């Protein structure tokens, strides 16, 4: 069931919620996160939302967690957050990165991730999910059946929305920045990824997601008299610090993606 959050708990009135910074897919990249936070602070927003996939990665899981707890953003759970706290001994045996993450995090961040909501109705206008309303693994906007990202048809997107009618839908998961109108009443925004600009995956079939530059990505959405305005940002950061930690943990594929915005072969 979709969780509804009261605007009073976020220290603003609902009619003041007009300018929202949207983050997703930080993936333990503290250095990218810090650059994005500094950029947001220079622009000014009413609230920051974090769409999940927060701590999975070979960079700085615990330090990223501690920084986010200081920042106290509105946050939902992503599929790889769930996979961390559900990880079994067999998962760790076949995935050394998962074992590193669990060792680095300790128990407190696992408890925090477990209490994060699957999705969130921020107010009557704005709905948050990590991937799609019914499944944290299914890309809402992107069709990867050909091995790379293409825009889904409006019919497919409507089916995946499962009746969710909020005027603004904020989603992540694909790491691919998108701004998509559905009919005349809905706008879907994917801010892209803060922490990882390319990857390969084998579900639901083998595919790559690539942004072709290393910049950390996020978005700001603003409600104006004419409707929602969207600004997508690409932020430079100290990539080499993240690369060094990925290489230290044996993840040359991550190092290549961090530097290039392309998936390794």
Stretches found by the model and what they are:
Residues 27-31, 56-59, 80-85, 121, ...:
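Active-site environment of divalent metal-dependent phosphoester hydrolases
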Residues 12-21, 121-127, 183-186, 227-228:
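Beta-strand-turn-beta hairpins that frame and shape the catalytic cleft
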Residues 23-24, 48-53, 57, 74-79, ...:
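Active-site neighborhood of phospho(di)ester-bond hydrolases with catalytic His/Asp-centered motifs
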Residues 40-44, 122, 162-165, 220:
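Glycine-rich phosphate-binding loop signature in dinucleotide/nucleotide-binding domains
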Residues 2-73:
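N-terminal active-site segment of His-dependent metallophosphoesterases
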Residues 154-182, 186-189:
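Anionic-ligand binding region
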Residues 64, 70-128, 134-165:
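Active-site neighborhood of divalent metal-dependent phosphoester bond hydrolases
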Residues 181-265:
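Acidic, His/Gly-rich catalytic cores of divalent-metal-dependent hydrolytic chemistry
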């Amino acid at each position: 069931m979709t969780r509804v959050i009261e605007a009073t708990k976020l220290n603003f009135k609902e009619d003041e919620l007009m300018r929202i910074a949207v983050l997703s897919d930080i993936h333990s990249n503290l250095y990218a996160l810090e650059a994005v936070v500094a950029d947001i602070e220079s622009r000014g927003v009413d609230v920051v939302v974090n769409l999940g996939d927060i701590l999975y990665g070979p960079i700085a899981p615990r330090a990223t967690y501690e920084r986010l707890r200081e920042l106290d953003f509105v946050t939902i759970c992503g599929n790889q957050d769930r996979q961390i706290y559900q990880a079994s001994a067999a998962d760790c045996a076949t995935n050394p990165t998962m074992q590193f993450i669990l060792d680095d995090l300790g128990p407190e961040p696992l408890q925090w991730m477990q209490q994060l909501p699957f999705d969130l109705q921020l107010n009557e206008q704005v709905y948050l999910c990590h991937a799609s309303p019914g499944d944290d693994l299914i890309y809402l906007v992107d069709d990867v059946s050909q091995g790379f990202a293409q825009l889904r048809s409006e019919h497919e997107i409507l089916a995946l929305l499962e009746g969710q009618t909020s005027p603004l839908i904020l989603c992540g998961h694909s790491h691919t920045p998108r701004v998509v109108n559905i009919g005349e009443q809905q706008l879907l925004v994917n801010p892209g990824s803060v922490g990882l600009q390319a990857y390969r995956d084998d579900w639901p079939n083998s595919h790559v997601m690539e942004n072709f530059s290393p910049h950390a990505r996020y978005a700001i959405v603003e409600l104006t008299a004419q409707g929602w305005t969207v600004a997508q940002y690409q932020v430079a950061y100290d990539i080499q610090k993240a690369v060094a930690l990925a290489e230290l943990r044996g993840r040359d594929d991550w190092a290549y993606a961090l530097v290039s915005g392309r998936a390794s072969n």
